[in-house]
Amino acid sequence: LIVKRIPCAEMVRFGKNGNDATTLAVRLARHVTKNNNILFCGYHGWQDWYISKTSMNGGIPNEISNYSHRFAYNDVESLENLLIKFKGDVACIILEPISKVEPICSVKCKHCKISCDGFLKKVRWLADKYKVVLIFDEVVTGFRWSIGGYQEVCGVTPDLACFSKAIAN
């Protein structure tokens, strides 16, 4: 049923929480691409690659944070700058299709949390251009906006998607 409803779903793997889902997605992207760097925006749990870039980074070796790079939500230029800087060694782009932690849009509007000016379509295009796995973290958005996740609403199909919360409650 899930495979029929979610645009990117060809297979489904269940885990116990959203943190495990995003960890597995990033690990899979690294395995498939043989690349190291992760480009992200938004919140993605407590795994070392993400939390190493926050103020709660105690106990995480610097070497881990060297492979994680934050870009600004709704800012295509900040993402492409990272894709250029780490070209040939980017495993994935992971983001929440609607950001709950990136409150300011750097494009035109203020306090924007929803994609502006085709942002998600541009992210998809950049992922294809640079041969990078695109992951939507739909832990919060999945099944709340649509049975097919926010990807169904916005018309952008990621390579991988992570769902949690609404599917279990």
Where are these regions (language model features)?
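PLP-dependent aspartate aminotransferase-fold enzymes
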Residues: 3-92, 99, 109-110, 118
